[in-house]
A protein has these predicted regions:
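Non-transmembrane, aqueous-exposed alpha-helical and coiled segments at domain scale
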Residues: 1-459
Length: 459
């Protein structure tokens, strides 16, 4: 239950906020030189803080100190994501379980190893007895990512050895979390719909012989019905989002927390909190918000109309007035984001049969017309591309997945990468992460109370 707002605290904190903003302000000049703001180098690349075998993101080559753009590539344990996805699409098989095995174990499984892993995963999908009734239904939340983080922390209490960081126990915890995340998300959504939207409560249990993608669609829909094509498209989404290198914000948070020696549930909950941010996992929802503004204000058959409205978005006079075109550009990818390429390739047919063909075409126009506009604003022609968030929201919408489930479902895929990176951090690093901040305050003496001057206004 949301606590009653009396306004007392707000009347106190409101007037102080402006002074606090002034006190916290740091001049841009302090960020020159050695300071790596946002852990970024001056050319926008990430500061190198470690090495990893789990995932690799490639969008450019370095030649003579200069970035040379290349088509984007994403590797899981040295194997290109595109090859993994294409293999499963050609065979008509579900691939997320194999990807999870590959990321965790470091190698591709044999048929026997994969079948055994799927069997274990089917057992891991079951939530602890009373978990949904005692936690999710007793304390419902309007935000599913907060509910997911709280659920992860609560799993600590169900674990007989939650602080054991042996490889065997880390692997056990990882398999359980990978299995349970989709079940938690599906149940969180059912509870949220019931308590906050007044819908009937439908809790569906996972079916052992079904894949992660099939089970999720079955659990999240009141009638449990889904098509094979829907399940395979969601399976591809899970594979695409399973891992993205150690430097992305949520994975880095997980590794930084793991370096302190904390337990698995705390580290993963921290990653969930990071992914919630609109600059990270919440970006696909911002793309969909922007897209709705575009749809309402343009003629989709007129490129000039679309371009004019995109200019207004960049000017900050339309949409959310942020001055941003969401879904364009990436910290690493330059010429293409391989994840976006895969989504565009395989979502087209679903768009046609689900009645989203016009939306799909308009989104492509936003990409096509938006990139040169952003480049023009930046004053350079450095290659940039649509990122995965440009198309993932529309794919989720085509699958009937509501917007407040977008990021939790992202987490249900990325949990495999988080767990693999946590294991790697604990096995290989053995040193707490401890970056430095340069203090830029001026020194002064302690002023006795009688000599202090009151603020000019606190009313």
């Amino acid at each position: 239950m949301i606590e009653k707002n009396t306004g007392v605290l707000e009347r106190y904190t409101g007037p102080l906020s402006r002074r606090i903003q002034e006190e916290y302000a740091i001049g841009e000049s302090y960020y020159q030189g050695e300071v790596k703001r946002g852990l970024r180098n001056s050319d926008g690349t990430g500061v190198l803080v470690g090495v990893t075998k789990v995932g690799s993101v490639q969008g450019y080559l370095l030649q003579d100190g200069q970035r040379v753009p290349i088509p984007g590539q994403l590797y899981y344990r040295g194997i290109e994501l595109n090859d993994i996805v294409e293999a499963h699409r050609s065979a008509g098989t579900f691939g997320y379980e194999e990807v999870a095995y590959l990321l965790l174990m470091g190698y591709l499984p044999t048929r026997q190893e994969l079948d055994r892993f799927k069997e274990i995963m089917s057992q891991a999908r079951k939530l602890p007895e009373g978990f949904t009734e005692g936690l999710l239904m007793r304390h419902p939340s309007g935000n599913m990512m907060n509910e997911l983080a709280r659920s992860v922390l609560s799993l600590y209490s169900y674990d007989p050895a939650p602080d054991d960081t042996s490889i065997e126990n880390l692997l056990l915890q990882s398999v359980k979390l990978i299995g349970r995340f989709p079940s938690i998300v599906a149940n969180c959504y059912a509870v949220k719909r019931h308590y906050f939207q007044g819908d009937s409560l439908h809790i569906h249990f996972p079916v052992p012989e079904l894949s992660t993608a099939e089970n999720f669609l079955r659990m999240i829909r009141p009638d449990t019905n889904y098509t094979e094509e829907e399940a395979h498209l969601l399976d591809m989404m899970l594979m695409v989002h399973a891992e993205h290198g150690g430097g992305n914000n949520s994975t880095f948070v997980c590794r930084a927390m793991s370096s302190s020696g904390t337990d698995t549930y705390s580290a993963i909950a921290g990653a969930v909190g990071s992914l919630k941010g609109p600059l990270h996992g919440g970006a696909n929802a911002k793309v969909m918000e922007m897209f709705h503004y575009v749809k309402e204000n343009v003629d989709p058959r007129d490129d000039g109309s679309i371009r004019d409205y995109l200019v207004k978005l960049l000017d900050g006079t339309a949409g959310d007035r942020s001055g941003k075109l969401y879904g364009l550009g990436h910290a690493v990818y330059t010429m293409s984001d391989p994840r976006a390429v895969l989504l565009k390739k395989y979502a087209r047919h679903m768009a046609e049969i689900k009645g989203y063909a016009e939306d799909f075409a308009l989104l492509q126009k936003v990409e096509e017309l938006g990139i040169p506009l952003v480049q023009e604003r930046r004053g350079d022609d450095t290659p940039m591309c649509a990122n995965v968030d440009m198309y993932s929201g529309l794919v989720y919408a085509m699958l009937g997945i509501p917007q407040d489930v977008f990021t939790p479902l992202f987490a249900s895929a990325r949990i495999a990468g988080w767990c693999a990176n946590r294991m790697e951090e604990l096995i290989t690093c053995h040193r707490i992460m401890r970056p430095a901040y340069r203090a830029v305050t001026t020194h002064g003496r302690y002023v006795p109370m009688a000599e202090r001057t009151a603020p000019t206004s606190e009313e």
